[in-house]
Structures are given as structure tokens and as C-alpha cells.
Amino acid sequence: PGGDISEPVSQATLRIVKVFWGLSSSLAYKRHFPAIDWLQSYSLYISRLQEWFSDNVSPEWNELRAKAMRVLQEEAELNEIVQLVGVDALSWKDRLTLEVARSIREDYLHQNAFDEVDTYTSLAKQFAMLRLILEYQEKGNQALDAGANLSDAVSYTHLRAHETLA
């Protein structure tokens, strides 16, 4: 059947190339391109590339990448809870995590190949964008620890409105 990668030829290929990009029909239906599932996909070259990214982009690159992956994994777990009992059952920190994950997905990972600006982004800009998104989470968590709630903060929809005006 389609999508079965457990058969011997696929397994041998995966051992040789050491990379797997799992395509997601649900992402494609949502018009999220490239429709690569970040939770199923992997590369065994990450350890080899860490030094290069640290030297050529930023020493923080690998840490930010790992944090972003944790946020996306946490989002998948939280979405299961949301489907069962609703978003109101989540703590403010969990809601913030969902907002940050949405920003990673929609603002960072999503591309429009037909848009001149979106077709290509330098590594320096990618780093700055990811750092900004994760800094939003850090500052948001600090505000929540200080007694604020997420509705007091600038919401993602307000950020979108400002982006449209800019």
C-alpha cells in the first residue's frame, strides 16, 4: 500500500540516504507547503551539521532548533487534549505553547514558492525569525509567572493585523 516504508527496498534506501521526509496529506489539505511532517521526518546528519551551523550561522542555532522541535512535539500532545476537552481546559502556559507552535508552523515553516520574498530566505534571517518566535515564548512565560494571563498579552491575531499594516 502507498506510504508503507517498512518493506525491504525502502528500508535499505533509508539506511543509505539517512534522511526521511514524511509527507503529510493533512498539511497539504491545509495548504501548508512544503507538506513535510516535522514529527515524522528525520535526518541522521544533524550531528555532523551542528558544528557547521554553529560556526556559520550562530552558536545558538542548534539550541533554537531543538527548542522549536520540542514546542512542535508538545503542540501535538496538547492538541490531543484540546480535541477531548477543549482549549479552556489548558493552562495559560499551554495556550501560549499552542500560539508559539502556530507561529513556528505558519510564520516559519510555511512557504509560498510563488512569492518573491518567501521563495528564498537566508540562514541569517531564518535564525533571527526563529529566535524572535522563541523569545516571544520566553517573555510570555515570564509574564505568566508574574501573574499575567495570555489574554492580557498581544495575541497572535493582533500580530497578524500589524504585519498586514507593515
Feature annotation, model-predicted:
Residues P1-V154:
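P-loop NTPase catalytic core
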